[in-house]
């Protein structure tokens, strides 16, 4: 039983840890990286393409790279000077143009030795191209290692991953749902998704049991992934799933469940105005790959009349796992975040004053007998204060960071009345009585941008059982056009709804999920950084979104019409027969939900909240691309133009 417990602990070794371990091993010339080794690291350069850069940047900081001996990290296609006495570690996709450039590096004898690591498996023919180039350049002995790393996915959280950031339009919702997509193009999209999912499971060290809905892109992914896993398991000598793949062995003593869902089962959630911190940051700010970019205006004070306003400073902040405030509050409702930032600031000020006081005591002259007698009592205190100084400075950095980020979010909430949108949409999605008419909000010039209004109307249109009459729809369309909205997204959603109506009933979103709590108390203090006047303090009630509900049915083996006809694949079974859902229906302990067609932080947060109530269970959320509502509306608009 102890072994089983240890295996479950290994399951908790998150995908982030596993991918980080794999990267560190690669940077250590594919030898396991030992944390406490005393020797100096071997100095080397890291050469990556944009794909490699996107995989590494959310996981390893520049300081961590330096600790691993990376003195320089350069893009493969940048102009690079020769450094003939230093080894180079390459981390790139095995594309034609990347291979050509690597062969050119060999010919130009840029580095002492070459460790070639491919993000995804390289084909035999491309490998031969490299071998020929090495031969021609008399550099065979310098090519030290060639490795397939199977790391073709991006980990953003301990329990969240996305397929790619570069070329994401290739696997986007629009790409999959284009009416004019050819079979060959669709095959390419599916192969791209399957390649990444295969890499994900190799890194996880587990072969999943796969469930998916029928007649969707998710089913096409399931069929191809099952085949790819099956072929790899059959080739016992070269199987990537035998033995100790990454130090932590198998995922756990029980295999994980992979639930493949199609974006089309729920188009309302990606358009929804949200109320939790991380999802809001993604919705209203420029936030991707865990980095938020803010524009801070440097003001126009004291500038002579008619002078140009000063340029806005761009600032970027990394929101990482070591940021305790972010880890604790990224899923909290926004007013709670504002309150917590304020509390942190006050506790920091108290500590800061203490340090100043102790420092001034130490600086006093000897004549002051009172001060000298206090000195001995205070030495211990001062030592602890000074030793905690770096910690205090880090705390101050995080407080400043979150003050800036939360202030930027708050500006959007107030300027666009996002609390009103959030509350109203929640009522629509949960079929609660609406307190004011939809037309009033659309026609209110002070409530939100044209895009906010379009999002609200689309959610109403998607969620309503009975589509509005033609006359009503014309009235809504006129109000939307008057508000400056582009009607293309509605065009697409109308076609989509007509199509899904034939297929199935619309997704239900459960009962009401918010209750207004009056305005904030603490944060309303005049001393607060955040003037929350007029912003509702809405408290969230846990309510499962469609993706979470589907996962719950399949993970707990519940019988439900929504998921009863989901296909079942077990790549370890000799004959692939999807009708054979096993009779012994044991609930799963670990599951991966993957959304084909794009995901969002609202769904991710909903799953995180759901699993909190399930002891000893783990969930990972993945998606083919991560978009916010603005990016999603743009795709719907392009589809509506067709």
From Swiss-Prot:
It is found in: Cytoplasm; Endoplasmic reticulum membrane; Golgi apparatus, Golgi stack membrane. Belongs to the STXBP/unc-18/SEC1 family. One of its GO terms (molecular function) is protein-containing complex binding. Interacts with STX17. Interacts with STX5A. Interacts with the COG complex via COG4. The modification N-acetylalanine is found at residue 2. GO terms for biological process: endoplasmic reticulum to Golgi vesicle-mediated transport; intracellular protein transport; negative regulation of autophagosome assembly; post-Golgi vesicle-mediated transport; regulation of ER to Golgi vesicle-mediated transport; regulation of protein transport; response to toxic substance; retrograde vesicle-mediated transport, Golgi to endoplasmic reticulum. It comes from Homo sapiens. The keyword Phosphoprotein applies. The modification Phosphoserine is found at residues 37, 303, 528. It comes from the Eukaryota. It holds the Pfam family Sec1. Keywords: Acetylation, Cytoplasm, Endoplasmic reticulum, ER-Golgi transport, Golgi apparatus, Membrane, Phosphoprotein, Protein transport, Transport. It is a peripheral membrane protein. Plays a role in SNARE-pin assembly and Golgi-to-ER retrograde transport via its interaction with COG4. Involved in vesicular transport between the endoplasmic reticulum and the Golgi. This is Sec1 family domain-containing protein 1. GO terms for cellular component: cis-Golgi network; cytosol; endoplasmic reticulum membrane; Golgi cisterna membrane; Golgi membrane; Golgi-associated vesicle.
């Amino acid at each position: 039983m102890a072994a089983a417990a240890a295996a479950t602990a290994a399951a908790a070794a998150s995908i982030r840890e596993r991918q980080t371990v794999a990267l560190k091993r690669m940077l250590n010339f594919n030898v396991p990286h030992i944390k406490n080794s005393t020797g100096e690291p071997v100095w080397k350069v890291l050469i990556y393409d944009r794909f490699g850069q996107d995989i590494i940047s959310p996981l390893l900081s520049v300081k961590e790279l330096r600790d691993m001996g990376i003195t320089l990290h350069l893009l493969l296609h940048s102009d690079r000077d020769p450094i003939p006495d230093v080894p180079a570690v390459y981390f790139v996709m095995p594309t034609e143009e990347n291979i050509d450039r690597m062969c050119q590096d060999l010919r130009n004898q840029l580095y002492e030795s070459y460790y070639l690591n491919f993000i995804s498996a390289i084909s035999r023919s491309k490998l031969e191209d490299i071998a020929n180039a090495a031969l021609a350049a008399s550099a065979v002995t310098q090519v030290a290692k060639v490795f397939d790393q199977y790391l073709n996915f991006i980990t953003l959280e301990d329990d969240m991953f996305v397929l790619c950031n570069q070329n994401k339009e290739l696997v986007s919702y629009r790409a999959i749902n284009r009416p004019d997509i050819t079979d060959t193009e669709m095959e390419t999209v599916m192969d791209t998704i399957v390649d990444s999912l295969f890499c994900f499971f190799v890194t996880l060290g587990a072969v999943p049991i796969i469930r998916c809905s029928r007649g969707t892109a998710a089913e096409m992914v399931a069929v191809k992934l099952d085949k790819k896993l099956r072929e790899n398991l059959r080739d016992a000598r070269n199987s990537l799933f035998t033995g100790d793949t990454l130090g932590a062995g198998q995922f756990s003593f029980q295999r994980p469940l992979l639930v493949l869902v199609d974006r089309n089962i729920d188009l309302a959630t990606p358009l929804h105005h949200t109320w939790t911190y991380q999802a809001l940051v993604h919705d209203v700010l420029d936030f991707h790959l865990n980095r938020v970019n803010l524009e801070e205006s440097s003001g126009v004070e004291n500038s002579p009349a008619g002078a140009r306003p000063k340029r806005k400073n761009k600032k970027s902040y990394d929101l990482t796992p070591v940021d305790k405030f972010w880890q604790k509050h990224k899923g909290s409702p926004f007013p709670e975040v504002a309150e917590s930032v304020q509390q942190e600031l006050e506790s920091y000020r108290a500590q800061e004053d203490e340090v100043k006081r102790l420092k001034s005591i130490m600086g006093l002259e000897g004549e002051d007998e009172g001060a000298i007698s206090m000195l001995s009592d205070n030495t211990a205190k001062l030592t602890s204060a000074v030793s905690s100084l770096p910690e205090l400075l880090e705390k101050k950095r995080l407080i400043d960071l979150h003050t800036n980020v939360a202030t930027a979010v708050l500006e959007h909430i107030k300027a666009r009345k996002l609390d009103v949108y959030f509350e109203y949409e929640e009522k629509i999605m949960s079929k609660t009585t609406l307190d004011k008419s939809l037309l009033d909000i659309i026609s209110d010039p002070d409530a939100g941008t044209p895009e906010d209004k379009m999002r609200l109307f689309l959610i109403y249109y998607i969620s309503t059982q009975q589509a509005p009459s033609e006359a009503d729809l014309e009235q809504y369309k006129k109000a939307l056009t008057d508000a400056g909205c582009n009607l293309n997204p509605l065009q697409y959603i109308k076609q989509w709804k007509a199509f899904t109506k034939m297929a199935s009933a619309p997704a239900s979103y459960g009962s009401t999920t918010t209750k207004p709590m009056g305005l904030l108390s603490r944060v309303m203090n005049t001393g607060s950084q955040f003037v929350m006047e007029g912003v509702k303090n809405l408290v969230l009630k846990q309510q499962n979104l469609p993706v979470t509900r589907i996962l719950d049915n399949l993970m707990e083996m519940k019988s439900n019409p929504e998921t009863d006809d989901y296909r079942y694949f077990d790549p370890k079974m000799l004959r692939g027969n999807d009708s054979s859902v096993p009779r012994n229906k044991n609930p799963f302990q670990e599951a991966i939900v993957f959304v084909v067609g794009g995901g969002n932080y609202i769904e991710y947060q909903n799953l995180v909240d759901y699993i909190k109530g399930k002891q000893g269970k783990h969930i990972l959320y993945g998606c083919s691309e991560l978009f916010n509502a603005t990016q999603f509306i743009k795709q719907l608009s392009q589809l509506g133009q067709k």
